[in-house]
């Protein structure tokens, strides 16, 4: 994404709009109200093959499978969960016979999911991705981007929770 797709005037306009939105909506940490949420319970993606997904997320990435049940809304479909730490789950559905197409980035859809990992585990995970032949890109020496077997983009980031590339975001 390094190629410039907008004129300098357009880029200046985008930055001016971000500045306006920050001024109008962003409050200093001490002035922000407490969130009404307590965390992400789970994010659910679609799997084309349950076993391939289990092998990728549990065996390669080290996220333990915690449950595998029938999808209550679609008989025959599986709903399964992986522990991604801090009492957060990554869930999947499969939809056998539904003919779900390949992953596509769409407006309102998932761009990527960033999962926090301990810095001391990050290098080992990157090494396992390399060893398994998974194409990946390392960014800022704390973040690695890759696609899962169904094309969903995943980022594993070793920055502290609430921080991104040295910037406090929480």
Residue ranges and their predicted role:
Residues 2-51, 110-113, 117, 166-170:
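N-terminal beta-strand motif that seeds the catalytic metal site of vicinal oxygen chelate
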Residues 91-95, 99-116:
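Helix-adjacent hinge/juxtasegments
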Residues 85-90, 97-98, 120-122:
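Short, charged/polar surface micro-motifs in flexible loops or helix N-caps
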């Amino acid at each position: 994404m390094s190629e410039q797709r907008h004129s300098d005037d357009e880029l200046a306009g985008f930055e001016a709009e971000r500045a306006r939105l920050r001024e109008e909506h962003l409050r200093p940490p001490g002035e922000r109200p407490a969130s009404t949420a307590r965390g992400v319970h789970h994010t659910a993606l679609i799997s084309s093959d349950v076993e391939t997904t289990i092998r990728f997320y549990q065996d390669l990435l080290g996220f333990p499978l915690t449950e595998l049940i029938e999808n209550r809304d679609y008989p025959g479909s599986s709903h399964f969960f992986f522990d991604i730490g801090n009492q957060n789950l990554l869930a999947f559905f499969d939809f056998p016979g539904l003919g779900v197409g390949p992953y596509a980035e769409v407006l309102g859809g998932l761009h990527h999911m960033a999962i926090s990992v301990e810095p001391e585990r990050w290098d080992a995970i990157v090494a396992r991705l390399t060893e398994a032949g998974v194409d990946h890109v390392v960014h800022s020496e704390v973040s690695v981007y890759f696609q899962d077997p169904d094309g969903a983009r995943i980022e594993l980031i070793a920055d502290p929770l609430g921080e991104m590339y040295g910037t406090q975001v929480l």
